[in-house]
């Protein structure tokens, strides 16, 4: 990004404070970009093929028999136990949509999904909607896995993994230069469960501590995986 200047050891971030004309500069050892769906507006993520995904969740009032629900019901959608008299019922999945207004058609989609999945239960009659809902945008990746780790320029990846683009195996593991910019993103629909572990992966890597995942799992969330896959697909 144009507001970020990096050297081999340090990073400078320039930004304007709200309603202020003066520019403030922060210098740090490392910058972690955790921008959610806002990452699509940053050129630092251009090579990662990420996309925003809109989701709408209904907040339906509780009543018998769902007032006794004490676990999350999961199928193609989900419904949670009541909190303050309401159940969360969701969620829609609309790719490349950054809008957050509540839509009646998505309410109907959510209700229909649950009515179909729970058709033979007494719960169906309790799925009464009174217009309360919210929508937000999460960030998704092509393989639906989180994206965690250092952000490298595509030209750097291309030079280090050049053998892949001509269909030849790598004779040794490429050594990428240290990056002072990393990301923790694409937590998708299940971020509450993946965020703590992914944060531990990133912090352990930065602090050179033992990593909490196997190599296979680390490769599955590595920031460079989309670029290397593209190089393999483009073999000449």
Descriptions of predicted regions:
Residues 1-12:
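A conserved short coil-to-beta-strand element within the FAD-binding core of flavoproteins
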Residues 9-11, 29-31, 40, 76-80, ...:
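Conserved active-site beta-strand-loop modules that form the wall/rim of enzyme catalytic pockets
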Residues 9-11, 54-58, 144-146:
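Short beta-strand micro-motifs in enzyme catalytic cores
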Residues 12-18, 183-186:
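Short beta-strand segments that buttress and anchor functional surface loops
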Residues 15-74, 103-107, 120-126, 213:
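Central helical "cap/lid" subdomain
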Residues 42-45, 98-100, 158, 193:
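Short glycine-/acidic-enriched loop or helix-start segments at secondary-structure transitions
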Residues 65-177:
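Active-site lid/adjacent beta-loop-alpha segment flanking the redox-cofactor pocket in flavoenzymes
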Residues 126-236:
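C-terminal catalytic lobe of FAD-dependent flavoproteins
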